[in-house]
Amino acid sequence: MDEEIDTRKINNSFLRDHNYATEADIISTVEFNPTGELLATGDKGGRVVVFQREQESKSQPHRRGEYNVYSTFQSHEPEFDYLKSLEIEEKINKIRWLPRQNAAYFPLSTNDKTVKLWKISERDKRPEGYNLKDEEGRIRDPTTITTLRVPVLRPMDLMVEATPRRIFSNAHTYHINSISVNSDYETYMSTDDLRINLWNLEITNRSFNIVDIKPANMEELTEVITAAEFHPNQCNTFVYSSSKGSIRLCDMRTSALCDNHSKLFEEPEDPSNRSFFSEIISSISDVKFSHSGRYLMTRDYLTVKVWDINMESKPLETYQVHDYLRSKLCSLYENDCIFDKFECVWNGTDSVLMTGSYNNFFRMFDRNTKRDVTLEASRENSKPRAILKPRKVCIGGKRRKDEISVDSLDFSKKILHTAWHPNENIIAVAATNNLYIFQDKVN
């Protein structure tokens, strides 16, 4: 990341775009695979679209950062729970990738109730010359077979297939909000509002409940789990966040049921800032370990915070994402925007944070220089390979030509889901039904 973050040049291209978005087309999750060669999106229609990065060519070196559609498949279908008389949406809540072990790719996808492990593989050859079947696959008349043939493989057009390998279901009473693959690559956890389950990737009919915060009397319920993630290299450690603004770090070596946390990260509330909305805006919508495992990043409604896992008392850093909305919390409560769940991501070196905002704005914070920038992902000012200009929001009556008034912000345009390439300065931003890819300008 360049030090001059607010003047850095960024190329962009949008890959998936419709003039008129239907509810099913709205992107609900974005995730790079561990190498960054693939990028997956899930939408409210239960579909997963996988993009593959262009291979570098000497004739067109500028195309190296571009991603093209690699595979599209229907991951989840709408279902109905007849016992509870509830519809189960097909919306993809999260996608996570397993590290590549062979020629195939293995993503995990989940809706509210069911997690699926998919295998994405390529075929560029097909068998020919069977003895008992013709080329169309029909059984041949044995009386017409006069010679014994040896089947051979013939080249064919490349075909990418997505097939479900495992289906993990019937383990969650409440809606799944996150999944996280363990660093042992043998297990993963799925999290709903009140419980966290640990699964073995090879076993679909049994999971272990490792966190259960459901009270005996549901009237005594005071908080719910909002997100959870495994430590990047300690397979026994994970964290989960709550709607009360706390983060709990748990060690599975201490007990099978991790209801008693090892560490509790919580910032004391400032009594002078106490208001009707305090509890709502302090709810954590996302928690992410840094790649090094030393830090935690959390996102609440107005801020991004960085925590040192060795210091529980207060965050190491606090970044204001859109503090200008503090005076508008009442109207944001009335239109339900105050309950929006924004995600946050680290760059590959843990030096820059990124998260979304309204009006199709997204924010970047450089931890080293303490500089920040607001950028916009929109069709109006984003043509392929265009350079993004920083945007500014003003609160007062007077505003400059390049500024936008807080009263002019479009709260229906919001960036909730973002992803950062694990090794390079390439980011993916989901704006309603559009997917934008941005990268540092090379020349």
UniProtKB/Swiss-Prot annotation:
InterPro entries: PP2A_PR55, PP2A_PR55_CS, WD40/YVTN_repeat-like_dom_sf, WD40_repeat_dom_sf, WD40_rpt. Its main location: cytoplasm. One of its GO terms (molecular function) is protein phosphatase regulator activity. Coiled coil: none annotated. PROSITE patterns: PR55_1 (PS01024), PR55_2 (PS01025), WD_REPEATS_1 (PS00678). It comes from the Eukaryota. Keywords: Cytoplasm, Cytoskeleton, Membrane, Repeat, WD repeat. It is found in: Cytoplasm; Cytoplasm, Cytoskeleton; Membrane. It holds the Pfam family WD40. WD repeats lie at residues 22-61, 87-128, 171-209, 220-260, 279-317, 334-375, 410-443. GO terms for cellular component: cytoplasm; cytoskeleton; membrane; protein phosphatase type 2A complex. Belongs to the phosphatase 2A regulatory subunit B family. PP2A consists of a common heterodimeric core enzyme, composed of a 36 kDa catalytic subunit (subunit C) and a 65 kDa constant regulatory subunit (PR65 or subunit A), that associates with a variety of regulatory subunits. The B regulatory subunit might modulate substrate selectivity and catalytic activity, and might also direct the localization of the catalytic enzyme to a particular subcellular compartment. This is Serine/threonine-protein phosphatase 2A 55 kDa regulatory subunit B beta isoform. The gene is ppp2r2b.
